[in-house]
């Protein structure tokens, strides 16, 4: 702490990102990255962009990328906003749309950046508890509020809500922004983007980090009706007019246009998720039903922190959260079948 800090800084509780360890022969299953490399078309576009005139600034409105996203999701270009990862898109969303006289609502077990952003932007927030089965109950959000944000599927649980439930939530909050964070939607959920034409209060946020395997490029986007997108643009242009470099725009555009690669890799991840769930359950784990590229599991005979440490000793890294109700759970990214087999073998040594 320093006397030179602005008053808000001392009160901040920064987000703690997943570890990026540098270990030989590591099975890295802790940050929900894709186990497969990006689309070859995306890699080719990135290389080509690196050969262009990098002394010039990139397109500040990322028109080509927004056109590709709009075409993929059958919306207009003016209904698409892009940013430097979905985290930046979410940050602009908090600043532009979520501060009101009544509190912002989000789940108590969820993406912890929501709490961080609420603190950063001075937003009053109420954390709504998950039910006994670790599910989001839409009825619990029928309370005084100024806005709502929740992930679907939720993280770290992986449990998704059907589109009908999401529509109920949006319809229950007319005149209030409802933000659906769909970082993991491509692994089994049904996107709320289809509801955007019907609801002027709905904003849907997605990322290229998971199903498009571009976590290292940092590209995210939001889709909503034009007034919501305009609010995000006003915040962006008051913060950083050039959030996406040439390589990011080119790579993401090629990635979203490569439908064959997308379907093949997400299909493999979904199949591997089913296999890993079965193997964990055979060994006594409780595994929550996942629609994400990870599973959330606990063993009745072993503390989560202890299991995570023993796996680490065997060069297998998973994510543990030392938080109430979920301290015995491990969040395990779906790797390749070979990586999942190494995880299972390590578990057989420690259980």
Curated annotation (Swiss-Prot):
Keyword Amino-acid biosynthesis: yes
Pathway: Amino-acid biosynthesis; L-histidine biosynthesis; L-histidine from 5-phospho-alpha-D-ribose 1-diphosphate: step 7/9
Catalytic function, reaction form: L-histidinol phosphate + 2-oxoglutarate = 3-(imidazol-4-yl)-2-oxopropyl phosphate + L-glutamate
Molecular function terms, GO-annotated: histidinol-phosphate transaminase activity; pyridoxal phosphate binding
Source organism superkingdom: Bacteria
SUPFAM superfamilies: PLP-dependent transferases
InterPro entries associated with the record: Aminotrans_II_pyridoxalP_BS, Aminotransferase_I/II_large, HisP_aminotrans, HistidinolP_aminotransfase, PyrdxlP-dep_Trfase, PyrdxlP-dep_Trfase_major, PyrdxlP-dep_Trfase_small
Statement: the UniProt record of this protein carries the keyword Protease: no
Gene3D superfamilies: Aspartate Aminotransferase, domain 1, Type I PLP-dependent aspartate aminotransferase-like (Major domain)
Cofactor: pyridoxal 5'-phosphate
Pfam families with a match to the protein in the record: Aminotran_1_2
A single GO BP: L-histidine biosynthetic process
Listed EC numbers: 2.6.1.9
Residues the record lists as N6-(pyridoxal phosphate)lysine modifications: 210
Transmembrane annotation, as ranges: none
Keywords: Amino-acid biosynthesis, Aminotransferase, Histidine biosynthesis, Pyridoxal phosphate, Transferase
Main enzyme class: transferase
Self-association and partners: Homodimer.
Family to which this protein belongs: Belongs to the class-II pyridoxal-phosphate-dependent aminotransferase family. Histidinol-phosphate aminotransferase subfamily.
Protein name (Swiss-Prot/TrEMBL): Histidinol-phosphate aminotransferase 2
Gene: hisC2
């Amino acid at each position: 702490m320093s006397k030179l800090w602005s008053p808000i800084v001392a009160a901040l509780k920064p987000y703690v990102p997943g570890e990026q360890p540098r270990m030989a022969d590591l099975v890295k299953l802790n940050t929900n990255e894709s186990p497969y490399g990006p689309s070859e078309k995306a890699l080719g576009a990135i290389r080509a962009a690196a050969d262009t005139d990098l002394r010039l600034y990139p397109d500040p409105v990322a028109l080509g990328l927004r056109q590709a996203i709009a075409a993929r999701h059958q919306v207009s270009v003016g209904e698409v906003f892009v940013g430097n990862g979905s985290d930046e898109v979410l940050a602009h969303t908090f600043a532009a749309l979520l501060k009101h006289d009544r509190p912002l609502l989000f789940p108590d077990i969820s993406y912890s950046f929501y709490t961080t952003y609420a603190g950063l932007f001075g937003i009053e927030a109420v954390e709504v508890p998950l039910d006994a089965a670790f599910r989001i109950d839409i009825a619990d959000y029928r309370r005084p509020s100024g806005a709502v944000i929740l992930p679907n599927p939720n993280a770290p649980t992986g449990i998704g809500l059907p589109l009908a439930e999401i529509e109920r939530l949006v319809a229950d909050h007319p005149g209030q922004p409802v933000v659906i964070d769909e970082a993991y939607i491509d692994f089994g959920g049904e996107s709320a983007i289809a509801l955007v034409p019907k609801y002027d209060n709905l904003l849907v946020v997605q990322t290229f980090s998971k199903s498009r395997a571009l976590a290292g490029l940092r590209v995210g986007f939001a889709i909503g009706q034009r007034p919501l997108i305009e609010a995000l643009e006003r915040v962006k242009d008051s913060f950083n007019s050039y959030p996406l470099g040439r390589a990011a725009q080119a790579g993401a555009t090629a990635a979203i246009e490569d439908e064959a690669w997308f379907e093949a890799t997400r299909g493999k991840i979904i199949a591997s998720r089913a296999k890993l769930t079965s193997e964990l359950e055979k060994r006594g784990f409780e595994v929550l039903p996942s629609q994400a590229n990870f599973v959330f599991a606990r063993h009745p005979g072993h503390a989560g922190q202890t299991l995570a440490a023993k796996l680490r000793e065997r060069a297998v890294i998973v994510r543990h959260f030392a938080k109430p109700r979920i301290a015995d759970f491990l969040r395990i990214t779906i790797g390749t079948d070979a990586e999942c087999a190494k995880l299972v073998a390590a578990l057989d040594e420690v259980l």
